Amino acid sequence: MSETIIVPHTPAPRADLTEAKRLMELGMHLVALKPLTKQPAGNEWNAPANRVTAIDPAATGYGILLAVNNVGSIDPDNWQQAVKGMAALGFDLDSIMDAGVRTKSTRPGSGGRSAFQVEGELRHLCFKTKQHGVVLELRATSPNLQDALPGVLYEDKTGKLCTQTYAGDKRWSVSSDMPQLPDDFFNWWEKCCTDLEFFRDQQEKFSAAIGGQGQLAVSGGKSGTELAYDARGVRGRFNKATSVESVLDRHGYLYDS
């Protein structure tokens, strides 16, 4: 008589949708993702009419729109090369990412992401080479950018199942409660967005540091050249830190207290 072998049933892994539910209830614009990917689902996925209003318990994850929620993120696709490239530009990428809402991925080689509130003239920038492909993205402003939320389940290029989780104590929230970028990095990112020649120079230095041939930007800012004026939001940090009275005092004006 043959012995019956009982194989224990292993339940399929499920996405953790806790954060998606919390952020939806905060009023943030979320988007549905294609099953087991980090790609948005459907046509016009970023339209207001298609924002998520209920969490599907069978979903494998949700994304958060960056521009409409006034947030942005740093996305190192190749962690080791991104660290090396940013070091050549004078920045400690690990410290900068620690300042934001940081997430980590189980995908090998991923540097995770770090999210911040967005102000000024920040926009989407990319550092890539012919040899390495995309190494680092600075993601902001474009209506076509979304970040997968912690808890997502997705397959990498090999079919391996991966997930993302928080990497520290900070959590996604409404923009006003999100961390600000460190001042020096904010100023540098903004200059890259408004001064094309500066940005191309930074791309070349980044690429040289990792032994690659850089694929350089062909336009910068909204005009493609250095801005000759202070655009909306550029003085935001100054205004927050400086009172009207102190400015008047500095220039010898009188005012009613």
Q: What do the PLM-derived regions correspond to, one by one?
A:
Residues M1-S257:
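Conserved phosphate/metal-binding and DNA-contacting active-site motifs used
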